[in-house]
Amino acid sequence: MAGADRPRLTSRRGFLLAGAAAVAAGTYGVTGLLQHEPKDTSTAKDVPASQASREITFPLTATCYLAQSSLPPVATLARYDLVVIDHEWPHRVPLDYFIQLRAANPRLRLLAYVNLVDSLSRLGTARNWPDSYALWQFRTPSSSRFPRAWLAHTAAGVLVHEYLDLVMTNLTDVCPSVGGQRFVEYAADWVTGRVWPAGIWDGIYLDAWGDTLWTVDQSQWDITGTGHDVPNAKIYGPGNPLDRGLTSGERTMRSRMPDAILVANGTRTLHAGLLDGLVWESFADPLVHRDPVFDLRGYVTAGAAAAHRRPGVSLTISSRRAPAGSADDYRRARFALAATLMQNGFWAPMGDDYGQPMYYDEMDGAGLGRGYLGHALEPDPPLSVITAATDDGTGSPAPYVYRRDFEHGIALVNVGHTAQHVALRRTYRHLSGITDRLVNNGTAVDLVTIPAQDGVVLLGPPSSP
């Protein structure tokens, strides 16, 4: 699909699947690069970033780029610390693209986007979707031999959907076996045997991979294939068949990819040492009926928990949902980033869809550079620290206002419904903005007013960067 003709889909799955449904064999390439045949990626084993380049300084920035027709220029993606792209891209573009990306930003982490939950009924050509053809067992763009036994359905044969009209797979640990495998075993084999060997990835983003599903269109279904429906309350949630199935898949992936970053949806239960962290779509966004207080508390708690693999990787995703360049656009961006800074997550702002990476003053300090705030003074702060009343340092300086301190500045976020005045006890200064000069005006302050559902990043004393 041409970018101008692509429907505006703010859900990452909806955007990605709109591209996956394209049947045309269109040429894939990198914006700004000559298009030619993809190179063999078998020599790319040294591409992932080294541990030495991954010192955690803040803010941590990300993009979740799911367009299927082209990748942005290297310089665009290299602005971010973490990049998510579809798992098929190593088959479509030259290996040089990824080598240049690493060279441009050595601390960048590259994750493959994978969805094992929503089965596909249509794809593009096998040349452009080879891994998806293998996973879903396609013979032609519209003909698949994927086993019905691995699809979720009721005892009466009614197919189960969790997202739009896409039939959900059966990832439980009691799914019927086909060829001696349950679907979760087959899926883990595919991730470790087809996606990971491309050699360019730092990790995998398992989208829709959660044991608590809120949008399934059936209240019960036949998880065992024996003709007996099981109520949802006995399928989903910690300790139930879906959780156990996902956990077995995570164990397989972790054992075969011990150093890989593995992240899953915010609805996933963390089990010790398996996942690195969670992904929060539409994080703290009241425009899509997310409760900012609930989201922030869950995000901070999950990041501080011992269950995820250390040091942990979490991701919050925000869609613009406001006129570009408007005061509301900038307020929403400040709010989402400041909330993300209350823990160690990467923040991914997206535009009208998941093919529009966004960038705001606060992400690099309006030109100060990556990680301009430096290290956090309280690593992995628990919720009890973030919410503790305080008039200085990390904590809560006013009702529903939270603060976190860094080497070179502070972040404050107001998740409440009323403006709050916050005394700072020392002088800080606003960023000297490029895009938003109204708030980021470079002025020195020792008292700030933070409007409802807004945030601010302030720099430390003038001697700091």
Where are these predicted regions, by residue range?
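N-terminal export signals
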Residues: G14-L34
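C-terminal segment of N-terminal export signals and the immediately downstream linker at the start
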Residues: G29-A52
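N-terminal cationic amphipathic segment used for targeting or macromolecule association
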Residues: A2, A20-V23, S42, V47, ...
